From Swiss-Prot:
Organism: Campylobacter jejuni (strain RM1221)
Subunit structure comment from the entry: Monomer.
The protein's name: Glutamate--tRNA ligase 1
Family: Belongs to the class-I aminoacyl-tRNA synthetase family. Glutamate--tRNA ligase type 1 subfamily.
Compartmental location: Cytoplasm
């Protein structure tokens, strides 16, 4: 069982989408179920509407799930599991205040040591715990042995008990911490493999320790994906526009192109242009590079152009939404436009009213002739016919003609454009 477990706290990051895609691919390859779990226990940071947005984005990428969970709905199980650990003396109530802990952290900092919980409340007698009326958290006792696990990308990893520490699993408001809720949910939902970003590596031994303490002995496998760097080689920030999947989609980049690029990023693929369905046949999670991958927007745009060309004409016409059969013309314009947004702008420039500027007179002459001109198969025949009838020459012929046909003074060679624009010439002459 594989899962994707986003939080509804902001726009979906491309790193999260990459994890979703990889989990989905591996689930399909292993013929296993795929879980979508919304981790919404951080109520203060949750944003209304983001849960639905996550589902909408996954649907756009053709990522389907067999099971859907809301983490906060498992709260009763989180509390039951925490109580079980306390009753078995594997966890304990900690009454240390934030101020007390902060003072100890400052002292450790001054001494040049890493702060570790000193066990102040671990050995409190039961009667002392019962009689104490202060707010408390629940801490899981640190493991007594080295925690080891295998990562498909990073290999064998191990963590010593002192580096895991006795960590908090339940807050004073009786809600679970991220690691506890995540570990319990993975256990309850029979997750067998976790693919996520490498920023979660330090969480893995804690989650392994939680499940082991609860007597869960089913093996879990992992793959921690390297971080995505920006074009300057620095970890990509959520503040950078193109780190947002929503921004990429709104910019006119196709879901299929984004998926193609994210699968290829930091990975050796048998070909450069492919679909998600094709990738399922050959993708190997263990072949993903350990090194951070640098995001290249230009490369993504190049891939997007290829995916636009791959779209069926009727589907592209629906996307362009101009009530015309413009797909062949739009695909021709991928030499200048890299996104659906840019293509729409190109098409609108062609089919909207135009500013003729200094060529007002010449454009009027040409438009009258173009209304009924014979649409020759060959551009040279078309051009010569129009030259002869208009008596215009050079710049005063070609510039006005380009404006009428494209709405711009610059663009592709008219001879190259002609086969794609030919059937619209009579219409353009009447705009």
């Amino acid at each position: 069982m594989y899962r994707f477990a986003p939080s509804p706290t902001g726009d979906m990051h491309i790193g999260n989408l990459r994890a979703a895609i990889f989990n989905y691919i591996c689930a399909r390859q292993k013929n296993m179920d795929f879980i979508l779990r919304i981790e919404d226990t951080d109520k203060a940071r949750n944003i209304a509407g983001k849960e639905e947005e996550i589902k909408e984005i996954l649907n756009l990428f053709s990522i389907s799930w067999q099971h859907y969970y809301i983490q906060s709905e498992n709260l009763k199980f989180h509390r039951q599991m925490a109580l079980k650990l306390v009753s078995e003396k594997k966890a304990f109530a900690c009454f240390c205040t934030e101020e007390e802990l902060e003072a100890k952290k400052e002292l450790a900092k001054k001494q040049g040591k890493a702060y570790r919980y000193d066990g102040t409340c671990e050995k409190l007698a039961d009667i002392d715990v019962l009689e104490c009326e202060k707010p408390f958290v629940i801490r899981l006792k640190k493991p007594t042995h080295t925690m080891k696990f295998t990562d498909f990308i990073k290999g064998e990893l191990s963590f010593e008990p002192e580096n895991i520490d006795s960590f908090v699993i339940m807050r004073t408001d009786k809600t679970p911490t991220y690691n506890f809720a995540c570990a319990v949910d993975d256990m309850l939902e029979n997750v067998t493999c976790i693919i996520r970003g490498e920023d979660h590596v330090s969480n893995t031994p804690k989650q392994e320790h939680i499940r082991a303490s609860l007597g869960y002995n089913k093996a879990m496998t992992y793959a921690h994906l390297p971080i995505i760097l920006n074009e300057e080689g620095v970890k990509m920030s959520k503040r950078e526009a193109h780190s947002s999947v929503k921004w990429l989609l709104e910019s006119g980049i196709l879901p299929s192109a984004i998926a193609n690029y994210l699968i290829m990023l930091g990975n050796k693929t048998p070909c450069e242009i492919f679909t998600l369905e094709k990738a399922i046949k050959w993708f190997d999670i263990s072949k993903v590079s350990k090194a951070p991958a640098r995001f290249d927007l230009k490369k993504l745009l190049q891939i997007n152009r290829e995916h636009i060309k791959m779209i069926k004409d009727d589907e592209l016409n629906k996307i362009l939404d101009l009530n015309k059969d413009l797909a062949p013309l739009a695909k021709f314009y991928t030499q200048e436009a890299s996104t659906i947004k840019e293509l729409k702008e190109k098409m609108q420039a062609i089919f909207n009213a135009k500013n003729f500027g200094e060529f007002e007179t010449e454009c009027k002459i040409l438009k009258e002739l173009l209304k009924d001109i014979e649409l020759f198969e060959n551009y040279e025949d078309f051009k010569n016919e129009l030259l002869n009838k208009s008596n215009l020459k050079g710049k005063k012929f070609f510039m006005p003609l380009r404006i009428i046909l494209t709405g711009n003074i610059h663009g592709p060679e008219l001879s190259d454009l002609y086969p794609y624009i030919k059937n619209f010439i009579h219409e353009l002459a009447r705009i």
